[in-house]
Curated annotation (Swiss-Prot):
Subunit structure of this chain's protein: Homodimer.
Residues carrying Phosphoserine: 189
Subcellular location: Nucleus
Protein name: Transcription factor bHLH128
Length: 362
């Protein structure tokens, strides 16, 4: 994760040459996350502590001032990635002003960025060995990714273990156990304070109990820790515990998708055991279907009309059965009118009749 001893020595030799130059490598951590961490830890300090400028030919002195760390501040490094630093009195006198101005900031930045002090000490060795020549550009390598930092802390060779049920990372062993414990608790205590936005959708399901550490799948820290009792700028990744309503909803879903109980099975058996001649439910047919009530009524009406027209065909002579219903009705009307005219003529003939049959009996 950090520079090895061979790369450190090669870079120091390269920077000590009169025309040697190098490249500054920055880790691509989220800028907003790192800026917020620095602002919270420093407490609103100057923005020079996080002014990551790009590659500039004239920014050698500025980068030197930025990466100058406290000589006595301890940095998190493994046994194989230690960096040799020349702590001579001349080097301390040369960088005395920068150490006095930036000692507190470097300590806090060392807590926020894993190998910051290691990089600053490498830069001091480069300045002491080769001097600050105008033609050489100091090169530093910085890894500030939080994921790599957590991986570095979780390694076994650093004597740090993550076997506590809470998410507070604590050292177990090592030469600087007490100091590292306070540093890590001040840096990595993810508490339940309401400092960030809440996420109510995720429930708390503990996993990974047997892998050396246990944590909640909902957040980094679901248990309450007492590392920030004074309330001084804690970094809180919090998730609220599920409410009673969400628990009820989850239980309802579980009972919905689970197998039915014995009582429900018995009820379904009784419901399905129906008589053969009974209809469990009468479904109304759609419009236009043969079983729809209006369709049935229309069919009955047409059947009734067809029966009457058949009787009319028998009464009306010379009516072809292949004619339409309208023609049949016209012929029937004409036939009825003819019959009425004949009836009127017969009545007139009866009134004008003079025979004896027309006389009334006395």
């Amino acid at each position: 994760m950090y520079q090895s001893s061979s790369s450190t020595s090669s870079s120091s030799q390269r920077s000590s040459l009169p025309g040697g130059g190098g490249l500054i490598r920055y880790g691509s951590a989220p800028g907003s996350f790192l800026n917020s961490v620095v602002d919270e830890v420093i407490g609103g300090g100057s923005s020079n502590a996080r002014d990551f400028t790009g590659y500039q030919p004239s920014s050698d002195n500025f980068i030197g001032n930025f990466f100058t760390g406290a000589a006595d501040s301890s940095s998190l490094r493994s046994d194989s990635t230690t960096c040799g630093v020349n702590n001579s009195s001349d080097g301390q006198k040369q960088l005395g002003n920068n150490n006095n101005n930036n000692s507190n900031k470097d300590i806090f930045l060392d807590r926020s960025y894993g190998g910051f002090n290691e990089i600053s000490q490498q830069h001091k060795s480069n300045d002491i060995g080769g001097g600050n020549s105008s033609g050489s550009y100091s090169l530093a390598r910085q890894r500030s990714s939080p994921a790599d930092f957590f991986t570095y802390l979780a390694s076994d060779k650093n004597n740090f273990s993550l076997n506590q049920p809470t998410s507070d990372y604590s050292p177990q062993g090592g030469s600087n156990g007490g100091r590292g414990h306070s540093r890590l608790k001040s840096q990595l205590s993810f508490t339940n304070h309401d400092s960030l936005a809440r996420i109510n959708e995720v429930n708390e399901t503990p996993v990974h109990d047997g892998s050396g550490h246990s944590f909640s799948a909902a957040s980094f820290g679901a248990a309450t820790t007492d590392s920030w009792d004074d309330g001084s700028g804690s970094i809180g990744f919090t998730v609220t515990r599920p409410s009673k309503r969400s628990k009820d909803m989850d239980s309802g879903l579980f009972s919905q998708y689970s197998l039915p109980s014995d009582t429900s099975m018995n009820y379904m058996d009784n419901f399905m055991q129906l008589p053969e001649d009974s209809v469990p439910c009468k479904i109304r047919a759609k419009r236009g279907c043969a079983t729809h009530p209006r369709s049935i009524a229309e069919r009955e009406r047409r059947t009734r009309i067809s029966g009457k027209l058949k009787k009319l065909q028998d009464l009306v002579p010379n009516m072809d059965k292949q004619t339409s219903y309208s023609d049949m009705l016209d012929l029937a009307v004409q036939h009825i009118k003819g019959l009425q005219h004949q009836l009127q003529n017969l009545k007139k003939d009866q009134e004008n009749c003079t025979c004896g049959c027309s006389e009334k009996p006395s």
